[in-house]
Amino acid sequence: WSSCQRPTMLDFALRYAGENRVELEKVLDHYRNDSLKYRAAVFLIGNMPYHYFYTGAQLDSLRQGYRWMQRTGLSAKAVKHKLWKTFGEPDVRRWTKRNDARSVTADFLIRHIDYVFGVWEKRPWASYYSFEDFCEFVLPYRIEREPLEFWQEAYVRRYGRLCDSLCAVNPDVVFVASALNDHLRAEQNWYASSDLSFVEYGALQLLDERFGGCRELSGFNVALFRALGIPCGIDRVVQNPHRKASLPVELL
């Protein structure tokens, strides 16, 4: 996500949206008298042409891997081969590419913006960050190319009370983030394997099923932190010291 300079990025996004332009303009009209939320809407809409996701029957089937593991008791690698044998290897040509600018509805975006602002405004560290930091590291409705869905509320239901209690002990954002990470490690309910990392999973699925490699774990953590109003993003270590590959890491 990059900072949006009106009119260039916003105007381009509205033109690019095609028939969906009316939905995006509804959002802008809705916030016409709220300067901060209007700027947030401009930021999100201006970035939409550069974000997309895929849909398709094969993709939905391939996302069943963890459920197959639970049902059959097979390893992640065995389930991967079974999925590919049943539904075919992942093939983007069988999926439909959908751009955010042409897919996001006014109801979705308004609900998202209102919810994120509601969480952010009650966090004691909100005043320490610029509005630009908020837009970049808390506001986005997606992380990568996962399904388009409203996920924040489910994360807050699961972890919001814990976050509030930690804020009451120490309102420092680093303390709260570290304590949340300690709690997640203590839960010990993440099935660590990259064998099922051949498609992208939504934040709601990762909240319920807790599986995957570095990409999925980073996505889950960023979704959780942002849902709780903790600024967070993903960077990439170019060279993993333990193997010949790069890996994503969360940054606070």
Residue spans for each PLM region:
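N-terminal Sec signal peptide cleavage junction
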Residues: 3-4
